[in-house]
Design a protein with these regions (language model features):
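Beta-strand elements within well-structured catalytic alpha/beta cores of enzymes
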Residues: 6-10, 166-172
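GST superfamily/GST-like fold recognition
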Residues: 174-178
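Active-site signature of alpha/beta-hydrolase-fold catalytic machinery across serine-
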Residues: 67, 179-183
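Active-site-proximal alpha-helix that buttresses catalytic centers in soluble enzyme cores
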Residues: 5-7, 11-72
Length: 207
């Protein structure tokens, strides 16, 4: 069994909804903006190589993965559980449109952790995305894995080229990244927030 896996997780490129600060979640099938696609393509060579490619099923992640990893894309492994948070009745709306909505204000006042009407709570998101991440680890190990921890977490930005070959690249969402890393590496949920096209590199140590 391989004891250490190197993984990079990348947030998809920017969408129109991101620009308008909307809650773009699990239900949305937005594509990248033309400008975002051009930026990702321009920086393609600065993203590290990987042996396997995993993605969320969301179209914006598929778009991004195809631009960064064109040679791996046809063999990509789609993991449904790595999709973004289900924002329920908040989906597609922004703060300005909901600032006087009692249900939205209650959710925000609770630290954005509670159950969203028609959607998920943060705990539900964390549970789902951790299940998806475990699928990634087990696919890499080719067997059931009963324990692992995440170490050596470093932020990745595509402005600096890296030469490391990773065991896996995951193209997913801001919520997915914050959920998985805050649960496995510790720290505040929002401390793992990244801009579109950025992400984190880390090591998975298998026990």
């Amino acid at each position: 069994m391989k004891k250490r896996l190197r993984i990079i997780i990348i947030r998809h490129g920017q969408t129109k909804g991101n620009l308008e600060k909307r809650y773009i979640g699990k239900r949305s099938q937005e594509t990248l903006t033309t400008e975002a696609a051009e930026i990702i393509k321009k920086n393609e060579r600065n993203y590290p190589n990987a042996i396997l490619l995993f993605t969320s099923p969301a179209l914006r992640c598929q778009n991004t993965a195809k631009l960064i990893y064109p040679r791996l894309y046809h063999k990509r492994i789609v993991v449904d559980e790595l999709n973004e948070m289900d924002f329920g009745i908040f989906e597609g709306k922004n703060f300005e449109e909901m600032k006087n909505d009692a249900e939205y204000r209650s959710w925000v006042d609770g630290g954005c952790t509670g159950q969203i009407p028609g959607g998920e709570s943060r705990d539900a998101l964390i549970g789902r995305t951790l299940a998806g991440f475990s699928k990634v680890v087990e696919k890499l190990e080719k067997q059931k894995v009963y324990g692992y921890k995440v170490t050596e977490v470093e932020k990745f930005t595509p402005e600096i080229r890296g030469n490391e070959m990773f065991d896996a690249a995951i193209v997913a969402h801001g919520g997915t990244i914050m959920a998985v890393l805050s649960a496995l590496a510790g720290g505040d949920y929002f401390s793992y927030e990244v801009k579109p096209g950025e992400g984190y590199e880390f090591t998975v140590e298998i026990s």
